[in-house]
C-alpha cells in the first residue's frame, strides 16, 4: 500500500511539475506583453505637452491601441484542482509543497482581481475619455479590426496630449502596470 502511495505521489508531482512549467511559460509571455504595454504608456506620457508637430510625427493611434492592450493571465490548474477536490493532496508528503499548493488558488484569485480592476479602469475611465478625442476606427487598425480607410473625421491628438486629465489617465494605467508586475 505504501509503495502504491509513493508511486501515485510521483505521478502527481510529475503532473504538477508539467502543469506549473506550462503556467510559468504562459506567465513569462504575459509579463512580456504587460511590459510592452507599460513601455507604450510611458511613450505616451513622454508626448504630453509636446508641440503639434512632434505629436503629428508620432503614430499615436498605434500607441493608444497598445496602451489599451492588457494581457489576461488565466492559468489552468486542473491537476491541482483535481487534487484538492479528490482529497489526494494528502498523498504529497512534502509539507512545504502542500502549503505552497494551498496558497496557489488565493494567489491566482488576487491576480484575477487586479486584472478585473485594471479592465474596469480602462473601460470606465480611459475608454470613456478617449471616445471624445480619438477615432477608434483609426486605433483599431492596429488590432484585429482592419479598416480600409481611416475615419472621415479630422483627428488632432495634440489637444489630447495637452490635457492634465489625460496625463492622469496614463499615470493611472502605469500604476496598474506597476502593481501587476509586483504581484
Predicted regions and their residues:
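Long, hydrophobic alpha-helical segments that serve as membrane-spanning/inserting helices
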Residues: 2-183
Amino acid at each position: 500500500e505504501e509503495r502504491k502511495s509513493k508511486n501515485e505521489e510521483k505521478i502527481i508531482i510529475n503532473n504538477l511539475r508539467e502543469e506549473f512549467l506550462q503556467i510559468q511559460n504562459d506567465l513569462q509571455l504575459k509579463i512580456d506583453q504587460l511590459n510592452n504595454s507599460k513601455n507604450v504608456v510611458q511613450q505616451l506620457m513622454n508626448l504630453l505637452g509636446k508641440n503639434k508637430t512632434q505629436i503629428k510625427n508620432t503614430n499615436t493611434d498605434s500607441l493608444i491601441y497598445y496602451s489599451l492592450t492588457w494581457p489576461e493571465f488565466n492559468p489552468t490548474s486542473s491537476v491541482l484542482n483535481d487534487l484538492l477536490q479528490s482529497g489526494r493532496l494528502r498523498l504529497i508528503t512534502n509539507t512545504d509543497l502542500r502549503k505552497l499548493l494551498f496558497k496557489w488558488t488565493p494567489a491566482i484569485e488576487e491576480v484575477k482581481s487586479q486584472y478585473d480592476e485594471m479592465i474596469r479602469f480602462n473601460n470606465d475611465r480611459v475608454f470613456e475619455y478617449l471616445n471624445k478625442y480619438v477615432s477608434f476606427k483609426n486605433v483599431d487598425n492596429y488590432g484585429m479590426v482592419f479598416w480600409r480607410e481611416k475615419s472621415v473625421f479630422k483627428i488632432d491628438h495634440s489637444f489630447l496630449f495637452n490635457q492634465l486629465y489625460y496625463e492622469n489617465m496614463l499615470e493611472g494605467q502605469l500604476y496598474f502596470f506597476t502593481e501587476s508586475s509586483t504581484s
